[in-house]
Amino acid sequence: MNEERVMDGREATISDVAASSQRIIREVERAVVGKTEVLRKILAACLSTGGHILLEDYPGLAKTLIANSFARALGLSFKRIQFTPDLLPGDITGGYVYDRAEGAFRLRKGPLFANIILADEINRASPKTQSALLEAMQEYQVTLEGETLKLPDPFIVVATQNPIEYEGTFPLPEAQLDRFMLKLAVGYPSGDEEQEILRRRRERRQDEFSLRAVTDAAGVIAMRQVIETVHVDSDVERYMVELTRATRRHRHVSVGASPRGALALLKLSRAWAAMESRDYVVPDDVKRFAPAALTHRLILEPDLWTDRRAAGDVINELVRTVTVPVLQETAG
């Protein structure tokens, strides 16, 4: 491992996490133009245990490119799975196949056995196949013919879906949505960003990008260990809880966010603090992630089911109205 890569867990510090995060984002931005805020939120999830990500946006907005670029910059193995109605659980988990040469069955591991999995158009797969992915996301293992096999560490699922296509899709069940740490929209580039995309492609003279690995699997694990040391004041913890609980009392919400939503806020806020070279969380860290961490966990009242923005409006309202703690002093 070269000197720029993250040190092992015994030596890594908050400053190491911040410096490495900057290098990772710079590397990803060699392929992805703009969208720095989205990229940093995705990195915060990648540096959090259980940081699965749902990208919901229109085709052609670099969702696949983002996932692939992060895998390269993080030095992690990457597999893309195109979800379709005829995709079977065994197609993603693998199974035992008969080897005629050896006269015995041997294990053929499926594409789930990688560090970063791009589950493209996840809502096009059948519920049975979705449930196989859910087990992997939840347990970090798969079961084949009664045998339990551990998945690589780290294991991160980046799933995509189109927000307007419903024909021929199987909406993700609430249990699976709740397993995603955050849900993000990439958004269209600005005019200048779109022109920059064209300029880079013209000068590169090919579609492919060449990105280097800033760290590796051991480095990501070391960064996660450092993030676990970030201090969270009890008042800030209470703020996370009150934001989450407020979703259950809102007039437009039928079912609010589970405690897993508060845990997502905790993990993401700590990761962001470390990326900002802080060893403590501030309320603004929580506010930053509230929409992405909570919106997809809400089940709205039936009259709002067709309003795609309603859940986000609820969270934005709660961010404005729930009392924000004032910290007397920070950890240092």
Question: Which residues are covered by each model-predicted region?
Answer:
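Pre-Walker A (pre-P-loop) alpha-helix and adjacent loop at the N terminus of AAA/AAA+ ATPase modules
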Residues: 14-61, 241, 245
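Walker A/P-loop
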Residues: 46-84
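Walker B catalytic acidic pair
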Residues: 57, 120-121, 132
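P-loop (Walker A) phosphate-binding loop of NTP-binding proteins
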Residues: 58, 92, 160
